[in-house]
Each structure stands twice: as C-alpha cells, then as structure tokens.
C-alpha cells in the first residue's frame, strides 16, 4: 500500500499541549495547595510535640510521684497527638493519589496523539483521538452548565457522560462543579457562605493578584445584614472585615456608612415601587388607554409622552426629597439585586484564573473558531425562492436541489455564527459546463437537464424535450437560451 499523508493539516503535539495547558495546571495547583497544607501541618505538629517534650522533661525532673503522673499524662498526649497527625497525613496522601493518576492519564493521552501522528498510512487513530477530545469538550460544557434546577434523575450529566466514555480522568470535574456550586449559590440563592469559605482558602492568591473579590463579598454581606435590619451584626461586619480596606476602597466605605443611616428610607421606597408595580399588573378598570399607560410605565419606568404633561399626584412620602440626592441614588444601586450578578462575574474571573481555565466554554470557542473559518458574506442570508403552480415541483426542488449543507447557515450554529467575523475568502465551486440563464442565475448545465428529466419522470411538471426549469424562480427556459460561461 502506498504511503499516504494525513488528510488533516495537523498541528504538532506541542501546540496541543500549550492549548490544553490547564489540563496540567489544575492538578499542579492542587498538589501545590496540598503541599503547602502539609508543610503547615508538619510545622504545627513539630511545635506541639516540642511543647509536650518540654513539659515531659520538667515533669520527669521533678523527682516525685506527682511529677511522674504528669509525665505519664504527657506521654499519653504525645501518643494521641501523633495518632491524629498520622490520620491527617494519611488523608492528605490519599487525596494526592487520584491527582497523580490524573496527571499520568493526561500524559498518556497526549502520547496517544504523538503515536497517532506517526501513523501516516492510517488516520483512524488520529480521528479516534479527536473524537475523544471532542467528548472531553462536551463533558466540560455539560459540567459547567449543571444547575440546581437539573432533574435529580439526571444527576450530574457531565460527570455521567465522561464516565460512560471512560475519560473522567481527563477533565477536572470537581473544580468545575465547585465553581458552579458557588456561582449558583450567589446567583440563584443569594448565599455568600460558599464564596466566603473559598475566599478564606484562597486568601494568599487573591492578595497576590490584587483582587477586589474579598472586599466586594464582605460589602455584600454588610448590605444583606442591613436589608435584614440586623444593624448590630452589620456594624460588626463593617468593623471586622471592611475597615481594613479603608486605604484602597475609601469611597465605597463612605457609601457603606451613609447606607447605614439611609437604609430605612431606601427600604420604604423599594416597598413603594414594588407596590406600584404590583398594582400595575393586577389593576384593570376596563379603560384601554389606562391599561396601555400602565403597561408602558411598567416596562419603561416612565410615562408615555401622551400623558407626560398631565398632573399626577406624587406618592405622599416625607422622605421623597432625599431621592434627588446623588448619594441617595447610589444607595439604591447598592441595594439592587444586580450586584449579585456582578459579584458572581468577579468570582468566576478569579476562580478560573487561579486554575488557568478559560472563563468561556471551550466547546463554544472551538466551534466559533471552526465556524469563522467557513463564514463568508453569502452566509446567513435568507434565500427567496419563488413558488411554482405545482406543490410537488416545489417540494422536490427543495429536497433535491436547494438543500443547504452549509454548517454556518445551519439553524443550530447560526446564533453562534451571527456575531463572528467573515473569513478572508469566498467559497467558489467550478462546474465543467457552467451556463447562465436569461435571468442571470448560473448553474451546471448537466445538473439542470438532469433535474428537468427527473421532474418529468415523476410527472411533477410538463416540459419540452429541450426545456429546463430554474429551481430558484421556477421559470421555464429553453436550452437555446443558455449562455455559456467561461471561468477565469
């Protein structure tokens, strides 16, 4: 068999390693964290044992029964301390085993690619490797998009899919699920506890990178305590967690202090607005104009021009004059639930940055790259096709001729492709015998004649021996009208 080359213009293994560097960054970071924890654990145990030995020596040197009893107790404490230390040590060692296994599996995965690339006579191993890699991307997407609303019967779709394919060690689902869990707690449940726990474990990294996450999280905690009227706890939170940021976030702390004084006014206005919107949705007096005005006000938060000049009695609140204050408007923004979404974005940015993971879905990135290389200026245009007098002709032409196999125009990928740039080329197709019809449409003469014969054979239309039908505008032309084209 003659030696052939790969049908794919394939980049080398180093390229793939750089592209998937996070596959090794995550286990490495986990091992580093484990190592730091072990060092702290060992240092703490050494200090504790030294203290025990000092007390033991003092007790043994006393030379009396009471001292001997203390020495015996110290020995028991030393044994107990060492046993606890061994258990903690073993726990950390056990946690490292699956991490090291992941690294080994991933190294072998890229060795498979290297071996597949060497088999130039058979691209099957290379295609199998890419299929496995595609499944990893699908598993990543499913894992990232697992929500608290997912059906219990489905469990964790991403993890289940990866296990079924036998590639669970090629993706760090635990890291993705942890990030997803914290993100869901923020956006769906407005729960700060998982985030604060993660911040506490990642303080050194956040401080090293100058992150605002800890401040914003504690600021949100302070705001939620004020909303719940837990003023003492809010003040304690301010003193314990926010004051240390006075040099870097002075303006925000000023607003935090002002919010404490204005919170009751803010809550009253929020209640008034909520009541007004509720009334708009529930009230219906049968007056079409009034209903239209209420709907407009609800969606656009202002009166339509037709009634702007009419006198409307203001809400009778003694504090409404405060709303003209610029700071007061800032306080209202602090109470807006949109802050949870902003906090979530800040968390995900730092979280994925820690592990070197792309914040965007890798599957969508790869799809976007592939689609953008195929997208031309002719893509995504809705074709206008004329209807003929015969429904059967329209159906057969649509099925046999006008079927669009372009992946960019496919309804599945069109939403992704719409915002992507055009490729620096156009797709051209040369025919052996291109002809132009009088209406300007260009076709391959053989295919046009074959279509005419097919439609006549199935009795969809009556055509003369030298007549053809344009599949676009459904007009009938004679072969004598063909204009021969010459590609240049």
Swiss-Prot record:
Pfam families: CTLH (PF10607). Disulfide bonds: none annotated. GO terms for cellular component: cytoplasm; GID complex; nucleus. One of its GO terms (biological process) is negative regulation of gluconeogenesis. One of its GO terms (molecular function) is zinc ion binding. Residues 175-233 form the CTLH domain. The keyword Nucleus applies. It is found in: Cytoplasm; Nucleus. InterPro entries: CTLH/CRA, CTLH_C, Fyv10_fam, ZF_RING_GID. Keywords: Cytoplasm, Metal-binding, Nucleus, Zinc, Zinc-finger. A zinc finger (RING-Gid-type) spans 406-473. Belongs to the FYV10 family. Involved in the proteasome-dependent degradation of fructose-1,6-bisphosphatase. This is Protein FYV10. It comes from Candida glabrata (strain ATCC 2001 / BCRC 20586 / JCM 3761 / NBRC 0622 / NRRL Y-65 / CBS 138) (Yeast). The lineage of its organism: Eukaryota, Fungi, Dikarya, Ascomycota, Saccharomycotina.
């Amino acid at each position: 068999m003659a030696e052939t080359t790969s049908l794919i213009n394939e980049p080398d293994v180093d390229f793939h390693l750089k592209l998937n560097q996070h596959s090794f960054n995550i286990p490495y970071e986990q091992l580093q964290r484990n190592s730091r924890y072990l060092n702290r654990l060992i240092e703490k145990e050494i200090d504790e044992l030294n203290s025990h030995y000092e007390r033991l020596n003092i007790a043994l040197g006393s030379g009396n029964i009471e001292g001997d009893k203390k020495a015996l107790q110290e020995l028991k404490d030393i044994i107990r301390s060492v046993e606890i230390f061994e258990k903690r040590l073993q726990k950390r060692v056990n946690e490292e085993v699956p991490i090291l296994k992941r690294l080994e599996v991933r190294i072998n995965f890229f060795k498979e690619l290297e071996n597949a690339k060497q088999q130039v006579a058979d691209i099957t191993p290379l295609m199998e490797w890419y299929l496995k890699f595609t499944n990893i991307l699908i598993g990543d997407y499913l894992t990232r998009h697992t929500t608290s609303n997912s059906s219990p019967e489905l469990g964790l779709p991403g993890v289940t899919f990866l296990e079924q394919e036998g590639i669970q060690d090629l993706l760090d689902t635990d890291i993705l699920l942890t990030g997803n869990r914290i993100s869901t707690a923020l956006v769906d449940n407005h729960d700060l506890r998982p985030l604060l726990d993660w911040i506490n474990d990642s303080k050194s990294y956040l401080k090293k990178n100058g992150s605002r996450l800890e401040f914003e999280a504690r600021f949100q905690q302070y705001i939620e305590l004020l909303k719940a009227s837990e003023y003492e706890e809010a003040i304690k939170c301010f003193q314990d967690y926010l004051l240390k940021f006075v040099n870097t976030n002075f303006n925000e702390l000023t607003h935090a202090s002002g919010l404490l004084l204005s919170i009751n006014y803010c809550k009253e206005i929020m209640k008034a607005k909520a009541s007004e919107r509720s009334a708009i949705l529930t009230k219906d007096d049968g007056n079409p104009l009034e209903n239209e005005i209420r709907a407009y006000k609800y969606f656009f938060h202002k009166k339509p021009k037709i009634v702007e000049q009419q006198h409307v009695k203001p809400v009778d609140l003694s504090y409404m004059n405060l709303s003209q204050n610029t700071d007061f408007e800032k306080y209202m923004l602090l109470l807006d639930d949109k802050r949870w979404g902003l906090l979530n974005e800040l968390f995900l940015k730092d979280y994925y940055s820690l592990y070197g993971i792309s914040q965007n879905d890798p599957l969508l990135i790869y799809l976007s790259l592939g689609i953008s290389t195929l997208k031309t200026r002719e893509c995504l245009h809705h074709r206008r096709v004329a209807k003929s007098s015969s429904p059967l002709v329209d159906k057969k032409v649509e099925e046999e001729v006008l079927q669009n196999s372009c992946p960019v125009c496919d309804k599945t990928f069109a939403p992704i492709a719409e915002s992507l740039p055009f490729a620096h080329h156009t797709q051209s197709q040369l025919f052996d015998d291109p002809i132009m019809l009088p209406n300007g449409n260009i076709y391959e003469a053989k295919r046009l004649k074959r279509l005419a014969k097919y439609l006549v054979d199935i009795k969809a239309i009556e055509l003369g021996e030298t007549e053809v039908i344009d599949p676009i505008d459904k007009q009938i032309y004679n072969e004598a009208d063909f204009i021969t084209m010459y590609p240049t």
